[in-house]
Amino acid sequence: MKIDLNADLGEGCASDAELLTLVSSANIACGFHAGDAQIMQACVREAIKNGVAIGAHPSFPDRENFGRSAMQLPPETVYAQTLYQIGALATIARAQGGVMRHVKPHGMLYNQAAKEAQLADAIARAVYACDPALILVGLAGSELIRAGKQYGLTTREEVFADRGYQADGSLVPRSQRGALIENEEQALAQTLEMVQHGRVKSITGEWATVTAQTVCLHGDGEHALAFARRLRSTFAEKEIVVAA
């Protein structure tokens, strides 16, 4: 069995360099919610050094609230902003001898695109316009995954090690209780259940079906590195290969 392990990087966390030794894919902030040109360049350099797949992590224009503010923007605006961000990272990667492999939206752009078909279409269209060979990463079973498939893109369905789930397979909003799983054992058990059995127990007790092709590790948690190491060790014990 194989699984991709991804982390959001270039967002000002001190653990970026170490996380890049543990993950197989890196989602690099493109300046709209965090990061800048030099940080993007540094992240790409480290990803290439560690053999980690390079991906763009575009966001709504929201540095003030780290890309977590809900926005209602016209689809054409989202299309242009997404194209702008992924184009910038693709060029930075190419300038250093690397290749951008995937795109994963950030924060509220990701969450809204999981449910809003027009927004999902704008993102998928931008990815396709930039490079039809790019992989589009989105929440398992979401509108974004459906939009990607409609454009003929390779999609990668994502699950979260440290996030609570609702009965419909969507994430518990960060503003609600149960959104984040602080208990390491619970997060490990949830991850294995999703990867090995394709299901997750919701905060209300029902089982939701999920397709786990990539697991997100948040690099901004207090114990992010320790958990990443434990997860890698657990995958090795279960003979689950980590690869992009």
Curated annotation (Swiss-Prot):
The keyword Nucleotide-binding applies. Catalyzes the cleavage of 5-oxoproline to form L-glutamate coupled to the hydrolysis of ATP to ADP and inorganic phosphate. It comes from Shigella sonnei (strain Ss046). Keywords: ATP-binding, Hydrolase, Nucleotide-binding. The keyword Metal-binding does not apply. SUPFAM superfamilies: Glycoside hydrolase/deacetylase. Pfam families: LamB_YcsF. PANTHER family: 5-OXOPROLINASE SUBUNIT A, UNCHARACTERIZED PROTEIN YBGL-RELATED. GO terms for molecular function: 5-oxoprolinase (ATP-hydrolyzing) activity; ATP binding. One of its GO terms (biological process) is carbohydrate metabolic process. The lineage of its organism: Bacteria, Pseudomonadati, Pseudomonadota, Gammaproteobacteria, Enterobacterales. Forms a complex composed of PxpA, PxpB and PxpC. Its EC number is 3.5.2.9. CDD domains: LamB_YcsF_YbgL_like. Belongs to the LamB/PxpA family. This is 5-oxoprolinase subunit A. It catalyses: 5-oxo-L-proline + ATP + 2 H2O = L-glutamate + ADP + phosphate + H(+).
